[in-house]
Swiss-Prot record:
Classification of source organism: Bacteria, Pseudomonadati, Pseudomonadota, Gammaproteobacteria, Pseudomonadales
Keywords, in A-Z order: ATP-binding, Isoprene biosynthesis, Kinase, Nucleotide-binding, Transferase
Uppermost EC category: transferase
The protein's Enzyme Commission number: 2.7.1.148
Pathway(s) the chain acts in: Isoprenoid biosynthesis; isopentenyl diphosphate biosynthesis via DXP pathway; isopentenyl diphosphate from 1-deoxy-D-xylulose 5-phosphate: step 3/6
Organism: Pseudomonas savastanoi pv. phaseolicola (strain 1448A / Race 6)
Reaction equations catalysed: 4-CDP-2-C-methyl-D-erythritol + ATP = 4-CDP-2-C-methyl-D-erythritol 2-phosphate + ADP + H(+)
Pfam hit, one: GHMP_kinases_C
Family affiliation: Belongs to the GHMP kinase family. IspE subfamily.
Name the UniProt record assigns to this protein: 4-diphosphocytidyl-2-C-methyl-D-erythritol kinase
GO molecular function, one term: 4-(cytidine 5'-diphospho)-2-C-methyl-D-erythritol kinase activity
SUPFAM superfamilies named among the record's database cross-references: GHMP Kinase, C-terminal domain (SSF55060), Ribosomal protein S5 domain 2-like (SSF54211)
């Protein structure tokens, strides 16, 4: 029996949505080596899916049909063990993962999976932790985890952990997935990376501030990403999310996004999804 067939027996099945960085500005490098950022997060109604069933023996077990997904170093397992340790819970969890989001794509796959795990286990283990506490634990797993825990589109500052809820337009997006995994560490260590963008002080963020400071470095290092940006740029403004590899463009309706997708996905992998300011994970949690 496959992991996905097993998931049908899960106590709770939840989505782990993708995110886009609608803009990403790098303000400088901190003494600890991390970079000060300003970015705008919005969710997509598309993502991974995870199933959860409580175990009585305290074991954390992850099953997936996707080859190459590590166990002990996987953020899902790390999140579960961190919450187990911090809460003192003696219960365990069987977890199933249906992976749709690419690894190294800049759309938050691993971070979103970790956040969904924290919220699911908090619910099933009946821990009663609030979002603030879960987000604080999430930050120890990755800078993008807190925004997924909170589930609202946000303007993020610091290393991405200082979040201000925002409500940008919710268009349809075509997301292209170049078949290359971009190393975030490699991009942020590149000597030619822009690191001196002046901070945005106006709220809400002006529409013209949609630049991604990582784009030039990623295009230079990864011709596959440059090609995807060029092709999509024939139809709409093409943007890079995070450090890539995924690129995206906004469309006023699904029909237009589907039309361009049909043309471009003959040679490139991609998907069409609706932008959402409230994550589909939180919409589902609200009805539990």
């Amino acid at each position: 029996m496959t992991a996905l067939q097993d998931m049908a027996k899960a106590q709770l099945v939840l989505p782990a949505p993708a995110k886009l960085n609608l803009m990403l500005h790098i303000l400088g490098r901190r003494p600890d080596g991390y970079h000060e950022l300003q970015t705008l997060f919005q969710f997509l109604d598309y993502g991974d899916e995870l199933g959860f069933t409580v175990r009585e023996d305290g074991e954390i077990r992850l099953q997936t049909d996707v080859p190459g997904v590590p166990h002990d170093s996987n953020l899902i397992v790390k999140a579960a063990r961190a919450l187990q340790k911090q809460s003192g819970c003696t219960l365990g969890m069987d977890i199933w993962l249906e992976k749709r989001l690419p690894m190294g794509g800049g759309i938050g796959g691993g971070s979103s999976d970790a956040a969904t795990t924290l919220l699911a286990l908090n619910h099933l283990w009946q821990l009663g932790w609030d979002e603030d506490r879960l987000a604080q634990l999430g930050l120890t797993l990755g800078a993008d985890v807190p925004v997924f825990v909170r589930g609202h589109a946000a303007f993020a500052e610091g290393v991405g952990e200082i979040l201000t809820p925002v409500d940008p337009e919710e268009p349809w997006y075509l997301v292209l997935v170049p078949q290359v995994a971009v190393s975030t560490a490699e991009i942020f260590s590149d000597p030619l990376l822009t690191r001196d963008t002046p901070p945005i002080k106006v709220r809400p963020v002006p529409k013209g501030n949609s630049r991604n400071d990582c784009k030039a470095v990623v295009e230079r290092r990864y011709p596959e990403v440059r090609n995807a940006l060029n092709l999509l740029g024939n139809f709409t403004e093409a943007k890079l999310t995070g450090t890539g590899s995924c690129v995206f463009g906004a469309f006023p309706n699904k029909a237009e996004a589907d039309k361009v997708s049909a043309l471009l996905t003959e040679t490139l992998t991609g998907f069409v999804a609706k932008g959402s300011n409230i994550s589909m994970l939180h919409r589902k949690l609200q009805i539990l």
